[in-house]
Amino acid sequence: MATKTMTAQELTDLRLGTLDTAVTDWETMSKRLKTLSTGEGGGVNAQRLRAEATAADWSGVNAGVTRDFVTKTAAEFQDVAGQATSVLGILRDAGAAFKRHKADLRTVIDDVAKRNIYINAKGGAVASVPSGAAAGSGDIPTPSDEELAVAESRVKRVLREASETDRIAARALRALARNKHDFTGDGPGGIKEADDRQGKADADYWARRVKESDPSEWSAEEIERFNETLIAQRDNPGFSERFATTLGADGTLQFWRDIADPGQGKTPEGERAKILGRLQQNLSMSLATASHVDSPAMDTWKREIIASGGKQFGHEGIMVKPYGFQIMSNLMVKGKFDSGFLDDYGSAIRTFEQSKGSQFNPAAVWGNPGIAAKLDYTGEGGTPGSDPMAGYLKAVSHNPDFATDLFLKRLPDDSDDPNAPTRTMADYLLSEREFYDEDDPFGEGDGTMQSRDALGKALLAAGTGLNPDVPAVVTDYDRTPEQREVLDKSLGLLAGKKDDFPPELRDDMAALLANHGDKVHQSASSLNSGDSALDYKDLLQVSKQVSRDQDAYGLLMEGVNQAIIADMHAPHEGDPKEELLRAGQTVGFMESARYHALDTDKDDPSWPAKWAYHGAGGVVNFVPVVGDALQRGVDAGAYAWQMEEQARIDDELAIDKSQNFQSRQAYLTALGEEWSRVNPGHKLSADGDEYLRQMDISLAALNGNKSANGTVGSS
């Protein structure tokens, strides 16, 4: 059943004239057959013939046979007319859909071309910037990796939708033409109905296979066929609801428990583990689609999934029995689940954990060897997937609006103190709940806590409104009050951890700060820490903790650099010298955070290897890119900063302890030059006054550095 995805070239070259002709021909055919069937317009017709044959007084040896033949023939005329109507509906809908797909692709191609992006024949996005000679004196920006990824994602979406139209139409037409001597009058009326029927038929088939066989014995080929069905039907509610509700809540959980880890030395590995990883993700997406269906059957399924969270599910012949929460959370790793379901499910996990007592230890419950089945195959080699909070938080990160609501959700007041501060889920997740290394629940493991890594992605989604797993290009600093509140709340909670700041959250917190770079810059450059947009002490402490990881620090500085340049280009009242001084002040602040991070870890034996600079990586798509006019200054500043950072690394991270900003003189110079480019008429931009400009921005950096150092010393 493997289906080929259409290429950009194939969709572009698709000629719809023949299809339009077929629609016209079938319109004529359908009208004629309908006339013969019902007699519209008068004349001989099957409906009249059937009525007369039924009412007639037949006699003779073959009377019964003849009556049946005539009435059956008359009925078949009606079926033929109905089938013709179905064919017409499929062809008409397909034609309209393909025209829409072609127009959508053309729109995307034309749109991304404005960003100097070319879409190749296969649908890939590549930079298309003319050479220096061809460009002349024009300053043509090269598209970023994030812009290329977004462009390619847009094209793939169109191609996937076009391929789905092709698949659904072809399957429906084949079904209608299956028997040349028999006709059906109840065919689908169009593409949408055909999609629904096909989805339900596939769901019935696979639900029956699950019930009538042992999924742990399925061959790799059969699992891959199921994968292909899940991919084809991933956004089809007809399939997803039917499959989930036919299996039922317990049946769904038991299926994954059986196929994921049958035990007895049969725990999947190698190629089968990879196939199961794909199945886990595809089934997650299908269940996510189902969660949005508003029907009594689906409501029952969701309630029963939650009710079964505290049940244990075994497998024949083995003692290991994981909880329903553990199984279901591993089927929530992909797709956007319904917000109401996520809220109810997350509350149920927390209630279950609380029922284990005030001294609840997640590792002792979820990591217990007696329930330690292998349920997660999404990572390299997979992880046990024992902490249900990991899969749940992945699902939260894929629904950013819900993520924001979750982190700000108030918890019941169980304190006797009337003045006790209001607790939220942010308090619970970032400060109260314990996490553990699923690979080694009762040992040291590799030091990475998978569920806390998922927590970082959920926090990032909550504070930015973006899905961390979807390419994006952010072009402004417009954030909702709720997203700002998530940032404020998380800053306070994580700053309180000081050097116990979770390493898994460094890159995500760096991305969150970069996404709110305007507020970070305003706060870091504040003359009065009490008036800063963000809490000055909290920002400094979190910036320090983020800076303990080279890549996270690089990402943070990408965001700060963008924000500084954007501030220089933004309209302001008063002397623009303020933006020059603020730039220096922020650089001094960030260098203080960086120095204290280095000083904290200087005795770590793994310290030298830890700091090789690799760049900020894929999460740069959270950094706002505010207009092409800024890009030259952004690039110049980033280049100067990176060169100085590399030199610092080569010099074993040497830094002037008293004046940390001194290692940033080239960066300060680049910022000063960009400021003069924006303000050519200012006296500090006059020829010969470069020294004065450099002195001003350097003194501002010194002031920012001293203020930050003093704050660190007092905390």
Named regions from a protein language model:
Residues M1-D182, S714-S715:
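N-terminal secretion-targeting helices of virulence/extracellular proteins
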Residues D186-V712:
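Non-catalytic all-alpha helical scaffold/repeat segments
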